[in-house]
UniProtKB/Swiss-Prot annotation:
Entry keywords, A to Z: ATP-binding, Ligase, Nucleotide-binding, Protein biosynthesis
SUPFAM superfamilies xrefs: GatB/YqeY motif, Glutamine synthetase/guanido kinase
SMART domains on file: GatB_Yqey (SM00845)
Uppermost EC category: ligase
InterPro entries hit by this protein: Asn/Gln-tRNA_amidoTrfase_suB/E (IPR017959), Asn/Gln-tRNA_Trfase_suB/E_cat (IPR006075), Asn/Gln_amidotransferase (IPR018027), Asn/Gln_tRNA_amidoTrase-B-like (IPR003789), GatB (IPR004413), GatB_C_1 (IPR042114), GatB_Yqey_C_2 (IPR023168), Gln-tRNA_amidoTrfase_suB_CS (IPR017958)
Subunit structure: Heterotrimer of A, B and C subunits.
Similarity comment text for this entry: Belongs to the GatB/GatE family. GatB subfamily.
GO biological process terms, semicolon-separated: glutaminyl-tRNAGln biosynthesis via transamidation; translation
Native species: Caldanaerobacter subterraneus subsp. tengcongensis (strain DSM 15242 / JCM 11007 / NBRC 100824 / MB4) (Thermoanaerobacter tengcongensis)
PROSITE patterns registered for this protein in UniProt: GATB
UniProt-recorded name of the protein: Aspartyl/glutamyl-tRNA(Asn/Gln) amidotransferase subunit B
Superkingdom of origin organism: Bacteria
EC number(s) given by UniProt: 6.3.5.-
GO molecular function: asparaginyl-tRNA synthase (glutamine-hydrolyzing) activity; ATP binding; glutaminyl-tRNA synthase (glutamine-hydrolyzing) activity
Length: 475
């Protein structure tokens, strides 16, 4: 019997507001524990919450960008459960009347696009953070308690781990473009839970779902789903039954492990939050927010293809990150070849960003500095290979490319007399390659060019080197 997977994703994104959802405490990441708290976010008796208007605005902004229907009337609810990081013993969230619903994202799949439905987007407060240090107990940092979140719940329209990955990449891109969240998974401002079940192909009844947690990257989501789908199919094929539970992804072992039985909605005893008035979003306010929406990733991709002549692949990669797209556009509007700019962004720049785990705005290279480097190559001051060395130095030090070239003596050897002397020396030292070239083996010329580059530590002008080698070899 063949099985298919049914996958739904729940994404929590912290909103980029300066203050918390129900009080004036700062949302700044990385402060000393319990320094951004007050009686409201600590849940002390007698305190009352006041809803931050910016939270509603950002949630509506995300909802509009994700093609949702925005509710004119919604309310907050209490979700009751006990956990040390939840000071009030309930979380203020939304239950039956979410702020946004019935949206969608379109992702690229083999042979076209696929629409993934978004069931709902609701606003809620974050919990604190448990710190497990030593064996005597756990500590709680309440700085995060009350930080505003949106929870984006997809429909179970996702069929494969690859589709889940593509959905998350697209969703992150849209949230970054709308500037409602910075989506930094390493700081916990974007968190993903997945629900997955399997069923025989051709049936419509859903199987028993498993929730997966501890997913620290989109690749981890993909790997965990791949493992869990295989595990569930194996259980069913062996005549077993799937137990509804929450499982944890163990990155080191590459497996999912049982965590706890899954709660149902009734376990939380939801009821309307009595201390907050309902949320009213007028059509006028909706339209005001809609007018502030920026150009979205898909529209920007199409424009980059037509305006800058980029191949579709380049445009897709560059526009997947708003920061990368902005950097590219600043370069491309001041440099003669947008394609060369995209090659650098997708090549050396992307490699160093991946190696260091940094974002493009966290490194000291500006668009003007990259253009200056590219012009040094255009003007034959340095070669393309030396440019990569210079760029790496720029990446880590923020130094100007011209200064690096002068300090390290990296200027290209373009003096014909000096280069001809080196070319003759290389020809003399490599008689076999000379013989091969004269027999028609063009590869031998490449070897000789490489030897000249080695001799000059990469500083020989490649075009002039080629020309002089051909001249000397034809004698």
């Amino acid at each position: 019997m063949k099985y298919e997977a049914v996958i739904g994703l729940e994404v929590h994104a912290e909103l980029l507001t300066d203050s918390k959802i129900f009080c004036g405490c700062s949302t700044k990441f990385g402060s000393e524990p319990n320094t951004q708290v007050c009686p409201v976010c600590l849940g002390l008796p007698g305190t009352l919450p006041v809803l931050n208007k910016k939270v509603v605005e950002y949630a509506v902004r995300a909802g509009l960008a994700l093609n949702c229907t925005i509710a004119n009337f919604s309310k907050m609810d209490r979700k009751n459960y006990f956990y040390p990081d939840l000071p009030k013993a309930y979380q203020i969230s939304q239950y039956d009347l979410p702020l946004c619903s019935n949206g969608y994202i379109e992702i690229e799949v083999e042979g076209g696009t696929k629409r993934i439905g978004i069931k709902r987007i609701h606003i809620e407060e974050d919990a604190g953070k448990l710190l497990h240090e030593g064996t005597d107990g756990s500590l709680v940092d309440y700085n995060r308690a009350g930080v505003p979140l949106i929870e984006i719940v997809s429909e179970p329209d996702i069929s494969t781990p690859e589709e889940a990955y593509q959905y998350l990449v697209k969703l992150k891109s849209i949230l970054e473009y709308t500037e409602v969240s910075d989506c930094k998974m390493q700081e916990g401002s974007l968190r993903v839970d997945t629900n997955v079940s399997v069923r025989p192909v051709g049936t419509t009844e859903l199987g028993t779902k498993i929730e997966l947690k501890n997913l620290n990257s989109f690749k981890a989501v993909q790997k965990a789903l791949e493992y869990e789908i295989k595990r569930q199919i194996k259980v069913l094929e062996e005549g077993g039954t799937i137990v509804q539970e929450t499982r944890r992804w163990n990155e080191a072992k590459g497996i999912t492990e049982p965590m706890r039985t899954k709660e149902e909605a009734h376990d939380y005893r939801y009821f309307p939050e009595p201390d907050l008035v309902p949320i009213i979003v007028t059509e006028e306010w909706k339209e005001e927010i809609r007018k502030t929406l920026p150009e979205m990733p898909d529209a920007k991709r199409e424009r980059f293809i037509t305006q800058y002549g980029l191949p579709e692949y380049d445009a897709k990669v560059i526009t997947s990150s708003k920061k990368m797209a902005d950097f590219f556009e600043k370069c491309a509007s001041n440099y003669h070849s947008p394609k060369i700019v995209s090659n650098w962004l997708m090549g050396e720049f992307a490699r160093l960003l991946n190696d260091t785990g940094k974002e493009i705005d966290e490194v000291p290279i500006t668009p003007d500095m990259l253009i200056e480097l590219l012009k040094l190559v255009d003007d034959n001051v340095i070669s393309g290979s030396i440019a990569k060395t210079v760029f790496e130095e720029m990446f880590f030090t923020g130094k100007n490319p011209q200064i690096i070239v002068e300090e390290k003596g990296l200027r290209q050897i373009a003096d014909e007399g000096e280069l001809r002397r080196i070319v003759r020396k290389v020809i003399e030292e490599n008689p076999k390659s000379v013989e091969d070239y004269k027999k028609g083996k063009e590869k031998a010329l490449g070897f000789l060019v490489g030897q000249v580059m080695k001799e000059t530590k990469g500083k020989a002008n490649p075009q002039l080197t080629n020309q002089l080698l051909r001249e000397e070899l034809s004698k």
